[in-house]
Design a protein with these regions (language model features):
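Long C-terminal interaction/binding lobes of large macromolecular proteins
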Residues: 113
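Active-site nucleophile elbow and catalytic-triad environment of alpha/beta-hydrolase enzymes
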Residues: 4, 90-103
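Amphipathic coiled-coil/heptad-repeat helices and related helical stalk/stem segments
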Residues: 35, 97-100, 128
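A short beta-strand-turn-helix
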Residues: 1-20, 41
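Structural alpha/beta surface segment adjacent to cysteine/selenocysteine redox centers
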Residues: 19-20, 25-93, 105-110
Length: 141
C-alpha cells in the first residue's frame, strides 16, 4: 500500500480518517456503484479511489474518468457520477488514468471494484458495509 501513488487517486476522508483503504473503480461498473453506496456508510476512513476504466467492458469509462479527474472538485464529481451516472463536463488536464490502468494491471487487478487495505489485503467485488468492516478488522491483524 505504501507504494501506491496516492496522488493519482481521488481522496475522501470521513470522520477522523484513521482507517485507510484504496479502491479501484470503473465509473460505468454497476457493481462499483453498489460498492460506492456501501462505502458512503463507513466512518473514520480515508478512501483513495483510483479511477480504473475497463474499456473493453465500458468504452465511455475512460473519458468519464478523465472528466472527473479534471473537475474542480474531484471527490464531488466522482460521488455525483457514481450516484446519478452523470459525468461532469469534459475538460482537458494532466491526468493519471493511463498510469492507474498500468498500476492495476501490475497489481493483478482483473475486475472492478477491488479494495486494497493499508496492509496489502485485497477484497474484490461489491461487498456490503458489514463485510468491509470485518475485512478492515482482519486486514489490520
Amino acid at each position: 500500500f505504501g507504494e501506491l501513488p496516492l496522488a493519482d487517486a481521488i481522496k475522501i476522508v470521513r470522520g477522523k480518517g484513521e482507517r485507510v483503504l484504496a479502491v479501484f473503480s470503473d465509473p460505468d461498473c454497476p457493481y462499483c456503484r453498489r460498492l460506492e453506496s456501501e462505502l458512503d456508510k463507513l466512518d473514520n476512513v480515508t478512501l483513495y479511489t483510483f479511477p480504473y476504466p475497463l474499456e473493453g467492458l465500458h468504452p465511455e469509462a475512460r473519458d468519464k474518468s478523465i472528466a472527473v479527474w479534471c473537475a474542480a472538485n474531484r471527490a464531488q464529481a466522482w460521488a455525483e457520477l457514481m450516484k446519478s451516472g452523470k459525468a461532469p463536463a469534459s475538460r482537458k488536464c494532466d491526468h493519471p488514468i493511463e498510469r492507474n490502468i498500468q498500476l492495476g494491471q501490475r497489481l493483478g487487478i482483473q475486475g472492478t471494484p477491488t479494495l486494497l487495505s493499508a496492509y496489502g489485503r485485497i477484497l474484490p467485488g461489491a461487498a456490503p458495509k458489514e463485510r468491509i468492516e470485518q475485512w478492515l478488522l482482519e486486514a489490520g491483524r
